[in-house]
């Protein structure tokens, strides 16, 4: 077999493969002789049909099958010989397939980039240090208490903490829109479940009042027909209800799910949950900083085939999200909407894979099991969840990739300049830091290509 490779543009490669005619014809003859034993034809005993007759009838079909198989096997062999790592499936163009001549074809594809990740000691990470206090537990208890409130109608103007039950109907530019009306909708003032303009408009109203509330939809509102536009909502107040909050005692603890141990066990459970949320948020913040700076310090050329595949995946996710939210069938979303995010995700996937490869980072099976157990603990039947994951290889791979990414982050943090920053739980949980992105899709994709 002869193999030659030329660079087309950037990461593009064109590989020409020649397979000797003798090898091709030997494979064809072997297949025909094997087929001969099963051929049934009038005038011949079973298995005794002359080879030339079998060749005449089945030769073209068998030859096509053999050529297809040879292309697949020799393509993989040629990649190994030339030490090439394709980023996606090739385009195969046959050049010579005539009987008695060498098989020749060209495979066009992109390769994964060759690069190094250096300068990890220049990465700076600010790691939050948060202690869960009694005040943090008290705050959660108070929220639980308010969630268990019982509401009773009152004959007075509404105020913060009250529940106002309303009917509403909205228009934009005088036209109705999807989801523009609701009946018997409960709104707890101060809970943040409605836009500020709504809560302000519903403060100080009484049962039977009719009012109009104006609200401008944000530019990023999912429904593009009303995004960024001002809406007018005609509102009828059905009832105003004042809350009555329960005492925090053992009966309250049992009501919110703590069957034994009363308030003391409830406080312990709350603290445990807060510690878990803290740890997850700290890990997310650290991961985001690491990923940002890995992108900054690494110069990498991205295979177009991977970026295009990621764009398609992000587009499908957005279309699915729009459909699930009850919006009309979305129009074809342009690739430009997703390109920046797609390039970022692909780059991170390649960088993570390179760090795994170059530093021989092995998947920690104990961490995989720990991650599964923590996830399953949030369900009523954790054992069933664990069993389901164990039987679903695709789901398990997702957990494994996420754990491997966390191991890469840990490795980078060990090399980086880390500053521990004390802060309160409220500071930590404030929505100021974007959620750490994952290179999961790309990591899995690229691992299969190596």
From Swiss-Prot:
Provide the Gene Ontology terms for cellular component: cytoplasm
> Which major enzyme category is it?
isomerase
UniProt cross-references to PROSITE patterns, sorted A to Z: FKBP_PPIASE (PS50059)
**What region holds the PPIase FKBP-type domain?**
161-246
Main localization (coarse): cytoplasm
| Segments for region (Disordered) | 422-450
Gene3D superfamilies listed in its UniProt record? 3.10.50.40, Trigger factor ribosome-binding domain, Trigger factor, C-terminal domain
> What Pfam families does UniProt report for this protein, alphabetically?
FKBP_C, Trigger_C, Trigger_N
Bias type Basic and acidic residues, positions? 441-450
Q: So what does this thing catalyse?
A: [protein]-peptidylproline (omega=180) = [protein]-peptidylproline (omega=0)
| Protein EC | 5.2.1.8
State the SUPFAM superfamilies in the record.
Answer: FKBP-like (SSF54534), Triger factor/SurA peptide-binding domain-like (SSF109998), Trigger factor ribosome-binding domain (SSF102735)
Write down the superkingdom of origin: Bacteria
Write out the annotated subcellular location: Cytoplasm
Q: Which UniProt keywords apply?
A: Cell cycle, Cell division, Chaperone, Cytoplasm, Isomerase, Rotamase
Reported function: Involved in protein export. Acts as a chaperone by maintaining the newly synthesized protein in an open conformation. Functions as a peptidyl-prolyl cis-trans isomerase.
Q: What is said about the domains?
A: Consists of 3 domains; the N-terminus binds the ribosome, the middle domain has PPIase activity, while the C-terminus has intrinsic chaperone activity on its own.
Family, according to the entry, reads as follows: Belongs to the FKBP-type PPIase family. Tig subfamily.
Q: What is this protein called?
A: Trigger factor
- In which organism is this protein found? Alkalilimnicola ehrlichii (strain ATCC BAA-1101 / DSM 17681 / MLHE-1)
The gene name reads: tig
């Amino acid at each position: 077999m002869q193999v030659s490779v030329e660079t087309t543009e950037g990461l593009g490669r064109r590989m020409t493969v020649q397979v000797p005619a003798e090898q091709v014809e030997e494979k064809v003859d072997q297949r025909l002789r094997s087929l001969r034993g099963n051929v049934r034809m009038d005038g011949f005993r079973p298995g005794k049909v002359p080879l030339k007759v079998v060749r005449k009838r089945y030769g073209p079909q068998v030859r096509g099958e053999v050529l297809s198989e040879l292309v697949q096997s020799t393509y993989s062999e040629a990649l190994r010989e030339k030490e090439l790592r394709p980023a996606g499936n090739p385009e195969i163009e046959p050049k010579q397939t005539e009987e008695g001549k060498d098989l020749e074809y060209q495979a066009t594809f992109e390769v994964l980039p060759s690069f190094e990740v250096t300068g990890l000691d220049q990465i700076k990470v600010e790691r939050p240090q948060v202690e869960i206090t009694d005040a943090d537990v008290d705050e959660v208890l108070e929220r639980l208490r308010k969630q268990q409130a019982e509401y009773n109608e009152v004959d007075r103007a509404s105020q913060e903490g009250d529940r106002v039950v309303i009917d509403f109907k909205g228009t934009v530019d005088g036209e109705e829109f999807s989801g523009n009306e609701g009946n018997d909708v409960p709104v707890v003032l101060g809970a943040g479940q409605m836009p500020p303009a709504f809560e302000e408009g519903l403060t100080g109203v009484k049962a039977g009042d009719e009012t109009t509330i104006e609200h401008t939809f944000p530019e990023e509102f999912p429904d593009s027909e009303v995004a960024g536009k001002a809406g007018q909502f005609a509102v009828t107040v059905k009832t105003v209800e004042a809350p009555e909050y329960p005492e925090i005692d053992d009966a309250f603890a049992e009501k919110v799910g703590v069957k034994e141990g009363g308030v003391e066990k409830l406080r312990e459970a709350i603290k445990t949950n807060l510690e878990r949320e803290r740890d997850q948020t700290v890990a997310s913040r650290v991961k985001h900083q690491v990923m940002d700076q890995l992108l900054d310090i690494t110069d990498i050329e991205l295979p177009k085939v991977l970026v295009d595949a990621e764009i398609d995946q992000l587009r499908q996710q957005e279309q699915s999200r729009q459909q699930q939210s009850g919006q009309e069938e979305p129009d074809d979303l342009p690739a430009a909407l997703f390109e920046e995010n797609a390039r970022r995700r692909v780059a991170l996937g390649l960088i993570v894979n390179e760090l795994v490869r170059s530093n021989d980072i092995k998947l920690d099976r104990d961490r995989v099991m720990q991650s599964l157990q923590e996830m399953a603990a949030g369900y009523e039947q954790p054992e069933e969840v664990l069993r389901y994951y164990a039987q679903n290889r695709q789901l398990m791979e997702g957990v494994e990739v996420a754990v491997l990414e966390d191991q890469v982050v840990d490795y980078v943090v060990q090399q980086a300049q880390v500053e521990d920053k004390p802060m309160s739980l409220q500071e930590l949980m404030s929505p100021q830091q974007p959620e750490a992105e994952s290179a999961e899709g790309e990591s899995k994709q690229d691992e299969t290509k190596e």
